[in-house]
Amino acid sequence: MKIKILSAMIASSLLIGCVIPTVKASQSAIKSIETNRTITKVRTGMLSGGSSIITTSYEGTVAAYKFNGEKLWENELSGFMNHDIWVQDINGDGLVEIFAANADGNVYCINSDGSLKWTFGLNEVPMNSVTVISDADEKYVVAGGYDKNLYYISANGELLKTIESSAYSEEGVFGDGVKPEARTHTVNFVRPVKSSDGTEKLVVLGTNNSLQSSGRFYIFEPFADLPSEKSRISIKKGIGDLRTVDFDNDGNDELTLGNSAQIGDAAISVMNLDDLSQKKSQINDIARRIDRFGYRVAQTEVVMNEGTPTYLTLFGSRILLTPESFDVNDSEILANKYSYYDIWKDKSSNKLVLASAQSGGSQVHIIDTSNPSWKSAYEELEPQGKLAAIQENTREVERQLSNFQKPTRERAPLPVYFISESRNEIPATIERSESLYDSPVFLNYSTLPNVENWDRSEVLADNPKYRDKRDRRKNYTLSSEEMFNKLSAGYESSDGISQWAGHGNDPYMISLATMKRIISSGDGKKTVNIYPEIEGHGDAFNKVLNDHFYPLAEFSSENNANLFMRNKHTFWQSTIYAPEWSELRSGRLADAFVPAMEETTDKSMEMSVAGRMGLWAAGSVDNWGERYARDNPSFDRLRQHSHQMVPNHALRQIIYKIASGARYINNFGFNQEYMSLAWELIGKGALYVPKREELLSLSPVHISMKEPDPIYRETSNNVKWTTFYDEEKDSIPYVFSRLNGTWPGAKTLPWDYSNYAADTKERRLDFIPKFPKGLVLITPVQQGKFKDEGTVRGTLADNMHPIYKDIMKEYITDGKNYYNANGEQVMAADSVRYRQIKNKIEEKSNLLPMTVSGEAAWVVAQSARKHLRLTLVDSGYLNPSNKVAKVKFNSVTPVAIVDVLSGETFSPDSNGVVEIPVLAGAFRFIDVKITEDLRNMQSSTL
């Protein structure tokens, strides 16, 4: 834990390599303070230097600033995210303490000078909310989280009382599948509410589902065992914000709340504590006046607007100013270019404080609402710091790329299929790319609100479950002929078509007969059928595989068509290894199936890329895919700050995955002008797209999956319920652990694959994983009792670069334990086995041409006889910053090291290490010339 105290304002040297002092926007209406970190929450309180701003960053660092921009101190705490912070004087000295509900399971109390006062925690289950409540003359800290308990803590950090939610909760469970126990909840929010007589009550907002339930209010007298009142919440979906206001200034607090949702469900509410009445307003009513798509949290304060109290709601990039009627149809709307993580009202000055822009910003912004120009100042606000640097770094790549010529020694770029780009936003850019380059390839993508209404009674007579399934988002109105005409027309003047052809809710949106006819009409042009969220169990789903998917895959293999399997959660390292999926694993349909992911709500991205690449490297499939959507950052559906207006995170995600071999890209069409840089990088050959036998950044150590442990399979794919925590069950070690809805932001365990293999320390958003010793593939079993029989895929080494021929090392797991090849030994996840694997990964990394450390993601591929292409990417998905990639050369001697875009050259030191800077939000493509062709070297000489 590191604490930094600053006694005077200093100009901060930014991670982006420049100095930016306090910046003023529109003179005195808005002041911006540079923090060098991505600030996710802001509060205010009195410190020794006066009224101050308290911030917490993406990685959990708490810092304090004066309103003039002077930085007072910072405390890095645990290095894990803070789900909540609360600022209040608890010891009566007139200065506030800061309380942080941390994802590591602790509540941290920080003194007013930034030093740590105390830590409270009973387990490693994330704390989610914290507050202070007054009872007579005493103040107490109250906190709760995902262990389903409410804790009263003394001013000195001692546990005073525990209230289990099962004693009073009314949360129900619903739906199919494995469900948690009813009448229990996690603590979504805990807040004090003041009455005009000076007394306080405690409001707990409890929920048990992050996506499909808003939960309930439970109102307690201080220290009471049971709530005195309970109330349902009037708006739907998970609640993302709860705060107290006093709109009429009568001394009695009201509650404002906003949900965490997309525009169709977005809503705000205000609750009167006297009678528990609620007023609500649906933001979707004014959707046409707001940028429509994206996932946001509605956050409401009260301000004086031209002398009148007004509800002010931050909703992504918009501020809604709503009168007392609380009807958003009457709102004044202020629009900015960027969305912000948080807003807070400083009651001592009535100023508003904005947290950083969600697109990687690093500033906080102080809005003086007493200034008549504050509204226009907000609309014109252009954050500087990291956000400005990220955009400039992208422009610099564009400038360098304009002068780039692909070396003649390199082969032509492989086709990369963009299967869902919109041709409406920037048609000229797509047409230019198509006219200049053979790759990327843009398919005609069709959205299908209307799908085929066909007679399933005979074909699915023995499968009533799927015979009767329908997707509520679709209208089943088209005949086979109408379905055919709609889709087959897309082949005209294009390289092919793509579309949703089914979903886990209904795989049969288009009949097999109609789909075969559509594919045939393309005369060999590319067809990609997208199947999201395909997950099933039992005989009924086996019939779907055997009657629909496998026959369609066989037909697709012969007709240049693919099934883009956009699955979720841990599918590619769990369910795919169930017996019913053996045909996909066999390799017989390798040219048809494309493993892809829909990773919203997930916290296991480093696993999913290893799982997809493992099937690719093994020969089960010939290609794999990647998807970007606006809600990719929604690992915690209760706090969906997923409205990034500059999709730099998505650009880096796509570049990393394409550099790793992904050639089917399913992007949500947003800000395509910015994203089109990836198209140009591919077309010109600066972004090298490798064949699997060219990759050299894969660890020789791989983890092979036998049939998954049933509990691992179930829990790792059950991510919406938040109340699964069971102390006894969760003490059992698993190789892949902490994957259900209980663990947002939690730290990974030392024996977890994510920790020892990928260097992923938290359950969050590792879309651009580091794998400093080489990417550790998750593969089908290669040898012994658990190997699939009757496959045609060959051995793993057969499909990989020749250097791997004799250096591979396999370890077998079912997701819970490890097994030896004959199945006679079973070793626990936390046994000596994981240390053996970790050590073997370290040992074998020296056989790779190079490895990279230093917080940059990396990929190496052989691009020509004596040339390697090293791709480096800033790994900070939502908190980009300057990185230094420390490249260590192992089995090769570099002759020359050159950035292919900038021309900058590098030389290793005496230890064979070269440090290469990677700017915030950026990426580099490095050519490494070596002394001989690695394909001709014997592995024993490496």
From Swiss-Prot:
Thermal dependence, as annotated: Optimum temperature is 35 degrees Celsius. Retains significant activity in the low temperature range (less than 10 degrees Celsius).
UniProt keyword Cell wall biogenesis/degradation, yes or no: yes
Main location: secreted
Pfam families xref list: Beta-prop_CGLA (PF25292), CGLA_C (PF25291), CGLA_M (PF25290)
Gene Ontology cellular-component annotations: extracellular region
Subunit and partners: Monomer.
Function of the molecule: Hydrolyzes lambda-carrageenan with inversion of anomeric configuration. Does not hydrolyze iota- and kappa-carrageenans, agarose or porphyran.
Protein's name according to its UniProt entry: Lambda-carrageenase
Highest classification ranks of the organism: Bacteria, Pseudomonadati, Pseudomonadota, Gammaproteobacteria, Alteromonadales
